[in-house]
């Protein structure tokens, strides 16, 4: 079908939010309404790297074709490193390639935005509208059961799930039924996933909203591999977008095409790209735009500011050789891969139907733990967290394998503790360096530039390390991926114990347990059993580690050297008063209806609109913003009542999966 040059509505960016907006609006009861969805990446339909949940780590590789990697300025807070922040580059955005973890924000998160229509109570009907909750539920008033996005445990659970939960419970972290109830901030749970259990497939935004609509409607036009250069503004009104090929034929003289919008343009390019599009369009800090050769149209200093993320780090551990993990599969073992693919294609179950992240916690410190923090952090905690008991400080979860480059570690079986800071105090920015859409931005994510972010990450390392050491599967620490404690420190990371090492090696191995004291020290045996030092299934425990100030310094150094993005960035087009607010001090970009200040018919809708952080994996928030934005656009067009349902056609088994789909 030929793509016309003019539409009623143009949605620029086919990520998690953009797909939701375009899919909903194309289902308005108006056969003459046309919607264009413009996406820089490729179409994701029938892509096994998308729909198979268990292959998601491949999308994190630096040579991935499904992500764009942005490099930051060098940072003193990261010991001189540059942060690398990937952004999805495929239809469906992050929902096509993320970790698939189902997590929802705390109620106070949305309330704190203080924007009309955006409180948790007001958003709850839209949050429920998103999902089909595919598990028994005691909170039916908080979940949805007929939405386009499916939520389940997948069709396979690694045994590290119950092992982790027993260990966490022994630390005083209660195991709860529903940690995503908007209020529980301290607990452990069997973690749900954005996976359709009926199909064994990832539940991404494009397959949920866009592809079903395009199979049933003629009103939605999809334009892929196309980058937005700028919005064209005439007499204060957004009237068109100028686009260029995603891959430049001639970067110095880009070939462009302009698409006009009769009613509305919605920018949904993500936290890094949305402010860059606005800046190239003449919307941003006027002095900066002039300095890079762009004529200012609207002076909005907040564009590109207030960059936030969740700060993540990983710590791996050995597990006993009989513990199932995904290591052999991701390492490329042909037997493991054939078995997993055969099981998925035959039954839609097995290890390819999970992300291997089976259990996790949200935690807040006790008064005793908080007393060990520095004074600056305690003041910040008192101001931000004390009166908001629904906000967790940290998250960590167990991954059933080594999450990282397997060429850098020996063969074996592992588990990885995956941590992220829920509400960092640090802030950053992203700015264009020229009017050329292919030029890299000036980017400083601000990771750890506020030292108050260090104590909770040190605390989480200690907490998760004790969880790991209390797990029955625990067999030692991958010392190369832990802090560099002093040799004589009791906190020093230790390798496989002797018995486990021998079990891995087998009877014919000649060098297993060869003593090489300058390189490795085995883990101690667990302490003798006593009533106060066992988990609920009577597993003996290793003694708790006591840390010195010197040990804490080693952990801080490790965190500075290894903290990275969690792919959860937000905030650069903040929905806040134009003059700014406490949570968006450099100025707001959007009003409560997502309109860009000073321009008619132009909205922004993606995670960049969040003026403050959310304590969750952000796919749920991106979808919530999408549902809200679709409603706002429809209301602007004059729709109300049941017309705002904009029901998506059902995703039916076999609709997208072609017979004989080639395996990897």
Curated annotation (Swiss-Prot):
Its EC number is 1.1.3.13. It is an enzyme of class 1 (oxidoreductase). The keyword Oxidoreductase applies. Its main location: other. May possess two different forms of flavin adenine dinucleotide, classical FAD and so-called modified FAD (mFAD), a stereochemical FAD analog, in which the C2 carbon of the ribityl chain has changed from the R to the S configuration. Conversion of FAD into mFAD was observed both in purified preparations of the enzyme and in cells grown in batch and continuous culture. The relative amount of mFAD in the enzyme varied from 5 to 95%, depending on the growth or storage conditions. FAD binds at residues 8-39. It is found in: Peroxisome matrix. The keyword Flavoprotein applies. Pfam families: GMC_oxred_C, GMC_oxred_N. GO terms for molecular function: alcohol oxidase activity; flavin adenine dinucleotide binding. GO terms for cellular component: peroxisomal matrix. The C-terminal peroxisomal targeting signal (PTS) is essential for the efficient targeting and import of AOX into peroxisomes via the PTS1 pathway. Catalyzes the oxidation of methanol to formaldehyde and hydrogen peroxide, the first step in the methanol utilization pathway of methylotrophic yeasts. Homooctamer. This is Alcohol oxidase. The gene is MOX.
């Amino acid at each position: 079908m030929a793509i016309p040059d003019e539409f009623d509505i143009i949605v620029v960016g086919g990520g998690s939010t953009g797909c939701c907006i375009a899919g909903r609006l194309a289902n308005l009861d108006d056969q003459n309404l046309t919607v264009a969805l413009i996406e820089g990446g490729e179409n994701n339909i029938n892509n096994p790297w998308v729909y198979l949940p268990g292959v998601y780590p491949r999308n994190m590789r630096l040579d991935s074709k499904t992500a764009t990697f942005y490099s930051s300025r060098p940072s003193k807070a990261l010991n001189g490193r540059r942060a690398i922040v990937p952004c999805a580059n495929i239809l469906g955005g992050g929902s096509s390639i993320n970790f698939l973890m189902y997590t929802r924000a705390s109620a106070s998160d949305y309330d704190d935005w203080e924007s009309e229509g955006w409180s948790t109570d007001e958003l709850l009907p839209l949050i429920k509208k998103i999902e089909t909750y595919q598990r028994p539920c005691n909170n039916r008033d908080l979940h949805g059961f007929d939405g386009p996005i499916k939520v389940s445990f997948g069709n396979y659970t690694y045994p590290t799930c119950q092992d982790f939960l027993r260990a966490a419970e022994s630390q005083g972290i209660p195991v709860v039924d529903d940690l995503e109830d908007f209020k529980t901030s301290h607990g452990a749970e069997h973690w749900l996933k954005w996976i359709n259990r009926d199909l064994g497939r990832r539940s991404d935004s494009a397959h949920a909203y866009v592809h079903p609509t395009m199979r049933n409607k003629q009103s939605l036009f999809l334009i892929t591999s196309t980058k937005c250069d700028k919005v064209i503004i005439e007499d204060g009104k957004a009237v068109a977008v100028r686009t260029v090929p995603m891959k430049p034929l001639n970067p110095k003289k880009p070939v462009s095409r302009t698409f006009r919008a009769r009613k509305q343009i919605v920018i949904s390019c993500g936290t890094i790209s949305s402010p860059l599009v606005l800046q190239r369009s003449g919307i941003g800090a006027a002095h900066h735009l002039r300095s890079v050769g762009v004529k200012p149209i609207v002076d909005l200093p907040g564009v590109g500011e207030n960059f936030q993320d969740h700060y993540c780090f990983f710590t791996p551990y050995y597990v006993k050789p009989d513990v199932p993990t995904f290591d052999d599969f991701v390492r490329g073992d042909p037997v493991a891969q054939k078995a997993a693919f055969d099981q998925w294609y035959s039954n839609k179950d097995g290890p390819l139907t999970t992300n291997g992240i089976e259990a996790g916690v949200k935690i807040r410190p006790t008064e005793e733990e908080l007393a060990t923090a520095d004074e600056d952090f305690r003041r910040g905690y008192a101001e931000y967290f004390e009166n908001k008991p629904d906000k967790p400080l940290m998250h960590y979860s167990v991954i059933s394998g080594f999450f990282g480059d397997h060429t850098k570690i020996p063969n074996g079986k592992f588990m990885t503790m995956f941590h992220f800071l829920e509400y960092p105090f640090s802030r950053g920015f992203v700015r264009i360096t020229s009017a050329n859409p292919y030029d890299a931005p000036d980017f400083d994510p601000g990771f750890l530039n506020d030292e108050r972010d260090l104590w909770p990450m040190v605390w989480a390392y200690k907490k998760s390390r004790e969880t790991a050491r209390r797990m029955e599967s625990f067999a030692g620490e991958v010392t190369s991926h832990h802090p560099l404690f002093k040799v004589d420190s009791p906190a020093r990371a230790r390798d496989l114990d002797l018995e486990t090492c021998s079990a891995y090696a087998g009877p014919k191995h000649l060098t297993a347990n060869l003593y090489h004291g300058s390189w490795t020290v085995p883990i101690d045996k667990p302490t003798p059993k006593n009533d106060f030092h066992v988990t609920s299934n009577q597993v003996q425990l290793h003694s708790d580690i006591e840390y010195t100030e010197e040990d804490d310094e080693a952990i801080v150094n490790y965190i500075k050297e290894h903290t990275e993005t969690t792919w959860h960035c937000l905030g650069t087009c903040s929905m806040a008063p134009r003059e700014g607010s406490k949570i968006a001090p450099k100025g707001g970009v959007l009003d409560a209806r997502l309109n860009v200040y000073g321009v008619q018919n132009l909205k922004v809708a993606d995670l960049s609109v969040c003026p403050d952080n959310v304590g969750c994996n952000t796919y749920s928030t991106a979808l919530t913003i999408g549902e809200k934005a679709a409603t706002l656009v429809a209301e602007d067009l004059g729709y109300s009542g049941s017309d705002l349902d904009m029901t998506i056609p059902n995703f039916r088994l076999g609709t997208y999966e072609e017979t004989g789909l080639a395996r990897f």
